[in-house]
Structure formats: C-alpha cells, structure tokens
C-alpha cells in the first residue's frame, strides 16, 4: 500500500537543493532519514549525501555498502533523538530533463519497496528554463512504484509532498551541508587517480588531465564551497545578533521583575 503523503523538513530540503545544484553534468543522489507514522505519512528529518562511484549523465545507483552505512547513521540518529529513525527514501537529481521518473527510476523504486513498502523516491529537476519567462526553474516530485494492471511492468504513482518550515537548520542537516564540498572533492580525486594510473598515457595527456582536475576543483570552490561559506558566515552573524537581542530582552524582563 502506498504512503499517503511525505513531509520534508525545510532544512533537509535545503541540503537536497544544494546537492542537486552542485553539478549540471551528472545526476547526484542521496538517502532520506526519517520515520513513518500510523497514518502512513513519511516524515523526512535529514538526508545523507552519497559519494558517487560512477558518474553518469542519466543514471545513479545505490550500492549495498552505502545502504548499510546509511542504516548505521539512522541508528545513530535514533539514539541521539530518541525517535524511530530509519532510511525512508532516496533522492536524485535530473539536470536539464523532466522531473518525472524514468523507467529505470520506477524499477529501482520498485526494488526498494520490496524491502520496505514505505520507501519513497524524490526527484529534483534543475537547470531547466521556463520557455515563456526565460527564467530558471527547479521542480521536485515524490513517487512510488505500483504494479501495472496489464503486464509485469511497474508504473509510478505520485505522492503528495509538503515542505515543513523550520526556523533554524538542524545539526544533522548542517553536517550534511558541510560534507558536500568534501564529497565532491573526493569524487574528483577518485576520477583523476583512476585515469592517472593508466600506463599508456603520454606526458602531454597527463598534464592536460591534471589541468582539468585543477579546473574542476576551482569550479567547485566557486560554485559550492564559496557560497556555502558565505551562508554560514551570514548565519553566524544572524545568530550573534539574536543572542544580543535575547540578552537585552532578559535584562528588560529582569528589571520589570525587580520593580514588582
């Protein structure tokens, strides 16, 4: 039986968006951590950004090792929060293409639902342009797979998704956001080392590959690390200002209490 709805907390939504917008050449993916209530509503509290072992323009996959690591992280969060946290879904990006899941996505989702009927899939379609306004858009959807009435194939069923606002970003989501630049850097290093280890490459090709590697790292610093650092600094300044305002409010209330 399909879930009735998905409630995605805004700080987890922020991490998903940052991850999806980190690259427009290949798809990215991650896992959703949360819980399912008695009304079959999936509550997503945080996400885990996965490291891609194979970069493809139109496909991403989850390895068993990554699922195991995510399950361990969910257990840690359950102990930390005292709530029944577990892996409740996965998300991936669709750069430059439609938000609707492909046949591969639907089959992959069906495979996960064999292990957990409450498992959901999220897709973030980015780097697309509205033809009328000529402005960029980001679309997102949530889906599950159901057996088609005719044949052995699966078809998607759209699940209502609601973004639940939060005044502040949670610790776990903040850690995931900070982890993103490191994971992207590791992916670039893995790709470079794999190519650089080939013995038949001539010196000019190796120099070219090194230049491409450096260029990609600089692009990541400009597009991901720089804006993330600026956002964290702005958030820190906002928190400091809030502390000052709360201290002034405390002093005012203390003075009023003393005059009573």
UniProtKB/Swiss-Prot annotation:
GO CC term, one of those recorded: BRCA1-A complex
The enzyme's E.C. designation: 3.4.19.-
SUPFAM superfamilies for this protein: JAB1/MPN domain
Compartments reported by the entry: Nucleus; Cytoplasm; Cytoplasm, Cytoskeleton, Spindle pole
Domain MPN: 6-149
Motif segment (JAMM motif): 92-105
Presence of the UniProt keyword Repeat in the record: no
Textual note on the cofactor: Binds 1 zinc ion per subunit.
Cofactor(s) annotated in UniProt: Zn(2+)
Binding site for Zn(2+): 92, 94, 105
UniProtKB keywords: Cell cycle, Cell division, Chromatin regulator, Cytoplasm, Cytoskeleton, DNA damage, DNA repair, Hydrolase, Metal-binding, Metalloprotease, Mitosis, Nucleus, Protease, Ubl conjugation pathway, Zinc
Molecular function terms from GO: cysteine-type deubiquitinase activity; metal ion binding; metal-dependent deubiquitinase activity; metallopeptidase activity; polyubiquitin modification-dependent protein binding
GO biological process: cell division; DNA repair-dependent chromatin remodeling; double-strand break repair; mitotic G2 DNA damage checkpoint signaling; positive regulation of DNA repair; positive regulation of NLRP3 inflammasome complex assembly; protein K63-linked deubiquitination; proteolysis
InterPro entries referenced in this protein's UniProt entry, alphabetically: BRCC36_C (IPR040749), JAMM/MPN+_dom (IPR000555), JAMM_MPN+_peptidase_M67A (IPR050242), MPN (IPR037518), MPN_BRCC36 (IPR033860)
Enzyme class of the recorded protein, top EC level: hydrolase
Domain of life: Eukaryota
One Pfam family named in its UniProt record: JAB
PANTHER family, sorted: EUKARYOTIC TRANSLATION INITIATION FACTOR 3 -RELATED
Family label: Belongs to the peptidase M67A family. BRCC36 subfamily.
Role, per record: Metalloprotease that specifically cleaves 'Lys-63'-linked polyubiquitin chains. Does not have activity toward 'Lys-48'-linked polyubiquitin chains. Component of the BRCA1-A complex, a complex that specifically recognizes 'Lys-63'-linked ubiquitinated histones H2A and H2AX at DNA lesions sites, leading to target the brca1-bard1 heterodimer to sites of DNA damage at double-strand breaks (DSBs). In the BRCA1-A complex, it specifically removes 'Lys-63'-linked ubiquitin on histones H2A and H2AX, antagonizing the rnf8-dependent ubiquitination at double-strand breaks (DSBs).
Quaternary structure note: Component of the BRCA1-A complex, at least composed of brca1, bard1, uimc1/rap80, abraxas1, brcc3/brcc36, babam2 and babam1/nba1. In the BRCA1-A complex, interacts directly with abraxas1 and babam2. Component of the BRISC complex, at least composed of abraxas2, brcc3/brcc36, babam2 and babam1/nba1. Within the complex, interacts directly with abraxas2. Both the BRCA1-A complex and the BRISC complex bind polyubiquitin.
Protein name: Lys-63-specific deubiquitinase BRCC36
Gene: brcc3
